[in-house]
Amino acid sequence: KFIRQNPNKRFLGLNFYVWVYEQADPEKDNWWNRFKRRIGEAPVLLDMSLTEQSVRNLKVYMDYRGFFSSQATYEVDTTSRKKRAFITYRTVQREPYRINRLSYDFRDRFLEQIILPDTVHSLLRTGEVFDMEVLDQERQRITTYLKQRGYYNFTVNNIEYEADTLGGNHLVDLKMIVKQHLAGYNEQGYPILRNNTVYRIDQINIFPNYDPTAAIAPDYRKGLDTIYYRGLNVVYHKDNKRPNIRPSVLRQIVPIYPNYVYNINRVDQTYNQIMSMGYFKSANVIFNEQADSVAKDNYVTFVGEGKEPADSVHQTREGYLQCDIQCIPALKQGYKIELEGSTTSSFYGLRATVGYQNRNIFRGAESFDVSFSVGYEYMKTPSARKRNAIEFGVNMGLQFPRFLLPFRTQRWQSIQMPRTRLEFGINFQDRPYYRRTLSSVAWGYSWSDLKYSSYSLRPIDINVIDMGYVNRKDFLDHLQNEYLKRSYESQFISGLSFSYVYNNQRKHLGGNATLLRFNYEMAGNLLDGLMHLFSRPAAGKDYYEVFGLQYSQYFRADLSVSRKIMLGEVTALVGRLYGGYGMAYGNSTSIPFDRLFYAGGANSMRGWAPRMLGPGAVPEPEDAVFPTQLGDMKLEANLELRFPIWGMF
């Protein structure tokens, strides 16, 4: 970051990249030589001017972090190895300068009543190191704080610092200067300064089918029409006869209303919700000052919002903004066709898949997708009783960019990216040794909050495996993999599931991070209650059946917590704790095999293959070729030190 010259990369301890680069003929400019130069790396030759610049960079950085008495030096060793130079940089930080006194100078006196009450959240404290990086962060924090309260034109350049170090003892008297808004320059070239303006929203125009190419035409606006809906002007072209998205849907995703005080959080929320619909390719939220309201001195009573005391009422200048939201839609419809062929020593196979997607099927950014698949296999084995295998399936999904609920959810301000998804799938397999049908139906909701959490709830989650026929003698009894053998059992699972994920990796990208996952599912309770009321077990059986299948009744929960602690720029200590428990009851004696816990694999103990670690619930036979260790409970912990290996060679 600060050193201007770094050694060449090495491969297995050798200067491989320099060697490749030097194989290129400098007098020939053909593709082969260009390829060598691109793959290789030019040798890094010692440049003392860059070495001096590196020392200056180190000194500037230490000054920037408050170590003004620091020193940076270097030594060059050219004798240890022939034609090689070794540079050693040394830094001495010494005692840092600290903040002795902090004061404020408000050139815009109205901002004093807003900023001073919020100093409890200030990043600047007396006694702390005079770190200019923290000073910049405080400027950004105040700017964001004011932009949340109507100060649209306020920037970090409106805040300056004056530092006085003449008092000695490595102490700094710091003054923050909050300036007025620079409105322009007069005829003599002097700046025109005014108090910062609080802006309200005037008109809100949304273009749900914006075409940037057509918008540059001189007569573009003549062909536009507008529908007004609850403070929102939905602008569309007359040739389309109506907007491509219903105004009521657009109103739900735009949390900006006329006469609202400008708030940058609502602007970000508007952009995120538009893009999360999945229908628009890009979007722009543009604000323009209304000249008629800005030009005149329009003084109104403004009550500071947020953390200010209730009596902080003052007179400030007010302006208005026109909001234009330009939404460029993606391709509405699409399809795919896939053909796949396969061959082994046992069979020939051919599979075809046709899929269709509509991203706006009901003019509300609803996404509908459906796919059909057909497969055929021909067995090469002449002794097989049946040499043909057929498989076909249908999968459908319908997703709404909102909650489908019998009550309104507009008041839930913390909910972001709400989704409702309906899914249906069925797959029929007719093979020489078995015949089965796999089907699933699900109704689920998903959403996230304003920070790091995401949620998923499936109140309806049904999965059915119906084994119509299986040849035990010639097929099932010969399977040595117990996990594979149990996959050919019929099962009926009807329940609900919930999952929660907390992940602050996006906020602390490259730094410390925490990842928490919680999953819970419960099956069979509602169905079991209905069966007890209206039915009874079949003769000779102590359990209930639905469509001739025993339904599962159980609950299952698991929790995983991971923590990453950076020990340097590329080295990290990562710890993980996992716990899970499941229990069958009522109509079941065991949890479905694919819901049991196991250890090993990429998401568990990576040193072991999946389902091969741990005793599980039932010990495996000693002669088992494919051990399958499954259980009703799992506790797991691991600790990893992650560091790059490539750079070590």
Residue positions per predicted region:
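Interaction-mediating elements
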Residues: 1-276, 285, 320
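Gram-negative/organellar outer-membrane beta-barrel architecture
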Residues: 111-114, 243-244, 260-517, 532, ...
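Hydrophobic alpha-helical scaffolding
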Residues: 132, 236, 240, 257-260, ...
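Amphipathic hydrophobic-ligand
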Residues: 67-72, 152-156, 348-352, 392-394, ...
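Hydrophobic residues positioned within well-ordered beta-strands of beta-sheet architectures
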Residues: 85-87, 172-174, 321-323, 352, ...
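C-terminal outer-membrane beta-barrel translocator/porin domains of Gram-negative envelope proteins
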Residues: 342-345, 456-648
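Flexible glycine-/small-residue-rich
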Residues: 89-95, 106-108, 176-182, 208, ...
